Regions:
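Membrane-interfacial, low-structure loops and terminal tails that flank and connect transmembrane helices
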Residues: 1-4, 74-80
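Hydrophobic transmembrane helix segments
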Residues: 26-34
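Perimembrane loop-to-helix junctions flanking transmembrane segments
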Residues: 33-48
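Interfacial helix-start motif at the membrane-water boundary
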Residues: 44-60
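Non-cytosolic membrane-interface motifs at loop->transmembrane helix junctions
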Residues: 107-118
Length: 298
């Protein structure tokens, strides 16, 4: 029992990263430096979807590092893998590009509405290193995936409401959640997130391309989980989640998401094509679901 708890505690920070960070939406007014302001419409940026995601992400990366340090100190085992080489090369390129950048602060912290500077990019690399070493058992993988899917379902439900013109962030409750009391009085009435004339899904990411990329990954992941699920209840559960991710993927109208699914599908067919074809009944059922979802959204 103690060993199980210890396994879960090691990967809890990873579970929090994949579940909490994507769902964060909060208003922040950011004063821009002179260099960035010349490329922006104002000398400040009103951010809802990126700044606090960055802060929570970096905070949880620190927590994951502590977990990783404790694990290495106790287990005295660092997994050996070739993946460290490309990760190291990428890390070197990030550091060099920041050093030689003319806009150092932008390189470090990122650009308005996309705060993915050097610190965050290094955080992405560290996530891979931590995951390689900390995720050692099926229990741990299931634990992290459970957190991810719960978050993805919640984000997916928000997306469906957006598609049908019922954006949660346009309701009073939604606005109060993403605005402080002071800012609610100032900007709540004029707050609006729209993309053209269509109810395009942006979920909790603002940019539909980011949403499309997120749902593309979750769509392909849950598609595989659906096929290899054991038991009718698990099959139905993962099938329903897969259809929800599919609906949001379509509703985001993201070219990046489309390319992601196409590329992933080729890899999936290459690796698991025979197993999927053998399970043709499950394939037929989910494809009927895709058709129904597509028809409902047309």
């Amino acid at each position: 029992m103690k060993s199980k708890i210890k396994e879960y505690l090691y990967v809890l920070p990873l579970a929090l990263i994949v579940s909490i960070v994507p769902i964060i939406v909060r208003y922040k007014k950011i004063e821009l430096g002179e260099v960035i302001a010349t490329y922006w419409t104002r000398n400040y940026n009103t951010d809802f979807f990126s700044y606090y995601k960055m802060l929570f992400f970096l905070g949880l990366i620190l927590l994951t590092f502590i977990s990783f340090y404790i694990y290495i100190k106790k287990e005295k085992e660092l997994k050996k893998t070739f993946y460290y080489i490309p990760l190291g090369i990428y890390l070197l390129m990030i550091v060099l590009s920041t050093i030689f950048s003319e806009a150092k602060l932008t390189s470090l912290y990122g650009f308005p509405d996309r705060y993915e500077g050097m610190a965050v990019l290094i955080g992405y690399i560290l996530i891979v290193v931590f995951a390689i070493n900390l995720l050692r058992s099926k229990r741990q993988i299931k634990f992290v995936l459970t957190f991810l899917l719960i978050s993805a379902v919640l984000i997916g439900v928000l997306g469906i409401y957006q598609f049908y013109g019922m954006d949660f962030f346009q309701t009073e409750i939604g606005k109060r959640l993403i605005l402080s009391a002071e800012n609610f009085e100032k900007i709540a009435e004029k707050l609006e997130f729209r993309f053209g004339d269509n109810n395009i899904i942006y979920a909790t990411f603002y940019n539909p391309n980011y949403a499309g990329s997120f749902f593309a990954m979750l769509f392909m992941l849950t598609f595989v989980m659906y096929f290899f699920a054991e038991g009718r209840q698990n099959k139905l559960l993962f099938g329903a989640i897969n259809l929800l991710m599919f609906a949001n993927w379509l509703g985001s109208l993201s070219r990046a998401g489309i390319l992601g699914v196409l590329f992933s599908s080729f890899i999936l067919l290459f690796l698991l094509g025979r197993k999927i074809i053998k399970n043709w009944k499950s394939l037929l059922i989910i494809f009927i679901g895709f058709i129904l979802v597509f028809t409902a959204g047309s």
